[in-house]
């Protein structure tokens, strides 16, 4: 995903490439038997929804984007019971930081 995300103005002005990793919890029994996408969650639709959300506005924190991703997924995909999302910045412009900052956030519908 690509987003205008970051605490610093220059991060939001340039925009950032992000990696979004998901673990989706749902009952897969029917999909396993029927082999129909309609009995599961359409992963292409999930991906497009996340891209649209990430590009829809500016974010200061990856924590906020992760929470909004989960909220949006629960609102669009009724079959989801739980979501674990990891959002990772792929390029960091801070000399004092090595690696890729990321957060993982889990929520269940219950």
Predicted features by range, described:
Residues 1-110:
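N-terminal, polar/charged subdomain of small-to-medium soluble alpha/beta proteins
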């Amino acid at each position: 995903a690509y987003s205008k995300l970051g605490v610093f103005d220059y991060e939001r002005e340039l925009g950032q490439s992000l990696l979004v990793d998901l673990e989706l919890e749902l009952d897969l029994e029917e999909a396993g038997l029927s082999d129909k996408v309609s009995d599961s969650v359409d992963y292409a639709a999930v991906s497009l929804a996340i891209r649209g959300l990430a590009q829809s506005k500016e974010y200061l924190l990856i924590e906020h984007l992760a929470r909004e991703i989960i909220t949006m997924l629960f609102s669009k995909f009724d079959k989801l019971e739980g979501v674990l999302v990891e959002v990772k910045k792929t390029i960091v412009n801070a000399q004092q930081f090595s690696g890729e900052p990321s957060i993982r956030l889990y929520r269940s519908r219950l």
